[in-house]
Amino acid sequence: MNPNLAILLGLLPAVMLAGGALVCAALALVRPGTRTSLYRWITLLSTVAAFVASMLELTAMTHDATGVGAVDYQGGLIIDRFHVFGTVLVCGVVALTVLGAQAYLRRAAGRAGAFCALLLLSAAASSMLLAQREMAAFTVDFALLIACLVLLTAMTKTSGVTAEAAFRQVLSGGVALATAVYGLVLVYAATGTTDLSRLATGLRVDGTRVDPVLAVVGIGLVIVGLLIVVGAPPLQAWTRHIQEAAPGPIAGFSSALGVVTGVAVLSRYGVEGFGAGSSRWTVLVDVLAAVAMLSGGVLAIRASTIRRLIADLSIVQAGFLLLAAGATAKTISGQAAAGPTALLYALMAAATSLVAALLLAGIFDAAGLGTGLEAYRGAGRRSPTTAGFLALALLALAGLPPLAGFIARLLIAETALDAGAGWAVAAAAVATTLSGVALFRWLSVMYAEDENESPFAVTTTPLVSRVTAWTAAVLGLLLAAFAGPLLSIAGGGATALH
């Protein structure tokens, strides 16, 4: 591929998204009373433009069997199928969010421009994070992503809970960024370069051996820093605050974008930087995955509100994604690891289930229904359509059959077993059982008889937003029905990481 063309195509999706953000911000400043529908259209058009740019990037790599078009700026910009896959998934999350946020934008019309600008800017940061393995580029993009997600939560000024959540996000986000950057400093000291791929060679730029202690500690700190957007222990409080306090569209977007970006970046760094299958990082990731799955399952059993249930199930889900990210070693039979392929398919299922569950929970919030377990008693009979789709989204989030989340977890368990992490698979089985018990506790209440039911109407949320939320929930079924072709697409996206 022509180097100049490669750079242009690699930057184009992020430029389209950032350009849309700039237009929304400028319009909000120049014409404060602009209709919210115009901001939605700008956001959707920018997202479509980024998608088209990604397809152009993919077309330019048609003849590259490795799936890698070019690597420029010492790993600061990577044009490959993995970047294309991640960017398209991010665009899908943005589209679902802006279509599902109509009710929120009506209530906060004065902040619609800022909302859409932050959506697009955070998506641009995510796209750039997926296209690099260089320390300076990572620091700038990661800081921008954290800042945008914090501001999205802080925009909801009508609730003291969201203000507190935003403040806590600032604190935890600062800690995570500092942790990751300090880890990168140690890696730089060990390798003598900002290109993380040098770690995999085991040699510094001057030809001497990499200091193993600095490398291992640095890798560990980078991984821990990334966990803030993934939503896994020890930094799961970041996403829990968003999921419990923020409006449904913001909570769904931040959770889905964070998990897609964080796990995908970790997967790229692990394979291309830390060394595929290297125990320097896979052991830590497997341990963190087991802790996330078990702690999330236990917390889900005790969940007293619908938002906490979603947050706890998402912790379990984050653990499964980490398990897939760590399954990069060759199998016992010597074949290439299938972990990256399983991971990309699982990210599709994870993103759609998170967006769907939180959009649907937001619809019930807007209808005046409480968030507690008893408030949902009989909701399945009072609002059968929306409650049914919420149940579908929760089943997908919990990884139960016959939805895509279940298929993804089976694939992840298989790849983890092949990579020699059978003990982590055992923890995954326990966590899935706990998640199922917690979910069926809620579903039994949702479809129970209750003579003292308080009335509510989901029609307070516009039809477009409700249909979007229902569609996101149905995607769990569609991803399962077309698992074969989608796994082939995921395999193509993972080519660069094998």
Explain the meaning of each model-derived region.
Residues M1-H498:
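Alpha-helical transmembrane segments of multi-pass membrane proteins predominantly involved
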